[in-house]
C-alpha cells in the first residue's frame, strides 16, 4: 500500500506541476497579447493624433483667409472681450510661431502668435477669444484651471526626467522594479494633467463662442467657422489625453508582468 500511495502522490505532483507550467505559459501568452494590443492602440493614437493635427492646421489656414465681418484684429478681439467681462490687469502680447497662442496665469498675459495678434480673420478672432476665455476662467477662479495651474510646476519637472526613468526602469525591471514603478507614478501625473486640461480647454472655447455670438463679433456663418476651428483644437487635447492613458497602461502591463 505505501508503494502505491507514494506512486499516486508522485503522479499527482507531476500533474500539478504540469498544470502550473501550463498556467504560467497561459499568463505569458496573455501578457504578450495584451502588450501587443496596447501597442496597436498606442500606434493608432499616434496616427490619429497626426491626422487631427494636420486637419487642425488645415482648418486654421482655411479660416485665416476668411476676413472677419467687422475687421477687428485678434488683439482688438481680446481687448474687447476683457472689457466686456470687466477684467483688468491682463496684458496682451505677441509671440513667435504658429499655434503658439496661450494664456499664462502666472503673469496674467494673453500671448498670441503674430498671425493671430495682427490677423483680422475668423481664425484670429476664434483663437484670441479662446485664450481670453482662459483669462476669464482665471478671474472667476474656475476650479479646473486652478487644479491645472497647481500641477504645472510638478509636471514641468517630471516631463524632463520621466522618459529616462521609464526607459531605465524597463531595462532593469527584473532586478530593480521599483525604478519602473517610480516612472509609472510620475507618468501618471502627466496623464492626470492631460485629462484635467480637457475641461479647461472645452470651457474656454464655450466662453469664447458664446461671447463672439452675443457681442456680435461674428455673423451666423462666421460663428459656424469659429466653432469648427475650436472643435478641432479640442480634439487634439482629447487625443493627447487618451494616448497618454494608453502609454500608462502599457507601462503598467510591463511592471505587473515582471512581478509574476
Q: What is the predicted function of each stretch?
A:
Residues 152-176:
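Post-HExxH zinc-binding segment in Zn-dependent metallohydrolases
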Residues 168-185, 254-260:
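Membrane-interfacial helix-loop-helix connectors in multipass membrane proteins
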Residues 35-59, 169, 176, 182:
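Hydrophobic alpha-helical transmembrane segments of small proteolipidic membrane proteins, enriched
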Residues 44, 53-159, 192-260:
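Polar-ligand-bearing catalytic/cofactor-coordination segments
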Amino acid at each position: 500500500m505505501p508503494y502505491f500511495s507514494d506512486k499516486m502522490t508522485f503522479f499527482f505532483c507531476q500533474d500539478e506541476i504540469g498544470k502550473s507550467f501550463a498556467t504560467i505559459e497561459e499568463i505569458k501568452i496573455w501578457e504578450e497579447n495584451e502588450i501587443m494590443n496596447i501597442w496597436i492602440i498606442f500606434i493608432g493614437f499616434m496616427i490619429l493624433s497626426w491626422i487631427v493635427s494636420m486637419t487642425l492646421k488645415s482648418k486654421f489656414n482655411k479660416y485665416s483667409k476668411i476676413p472677419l465681418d467687422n475687421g477687428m484684429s485678434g488683439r482688438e478681439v481680446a481687448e474687447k472681450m476683457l472689457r466686456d467681462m470687466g477684467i483688468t490687469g491682463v496684458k496682451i502680447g505677441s509671440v513667435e510661431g504658429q499655434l503658439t497662442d496661450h494664456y499664462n496665469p502666472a503673469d496674467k498675459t494673453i500671448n498670441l502668435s503674430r498671425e493671430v495678434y495682427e490677423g483680422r480673420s475668423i481664425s484670429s478672432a476664434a483663437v484670441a477669444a479662446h485664450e481670453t476665455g482662459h483669462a476669464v476662467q482665471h478671474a472667476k477662479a474656475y476650479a479646473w484651471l486652478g487644479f491645472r495651474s497647481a500641477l504645472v510646476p510638478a509636471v514641468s519637472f517630471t516631463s524632463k526626467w520621466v522618459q529616462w526613468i521609464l526607459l531605465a526602469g524597463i531595462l532593469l525591471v527584473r532586478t530593480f522594479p521599483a525604478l519602473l514603478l517610480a516612472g509609472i507614478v510620475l507618468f501618471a501625473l502627466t496623464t492626470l494633467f492631460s485629462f484635467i486640461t480637457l475641461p479647461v480647454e472645452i470651457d474656454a472655447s464655450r466662453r469664447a463662442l458664446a461671447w463672439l455670438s452675443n457681442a456680435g463679433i461674428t455673423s451666423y456663418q462666421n460663428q459656424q467657422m469659429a466653432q469648427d476651428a475650436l472643435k478641432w483644437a479640442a480634439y487634439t487635447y482629447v487625443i493627447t489625453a487618451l494616448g497618454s492613458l494608453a502609454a500608462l497602461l502599457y507601462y503598467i502591463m510591463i511592471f505587473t508582468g515582471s512581478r509574476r
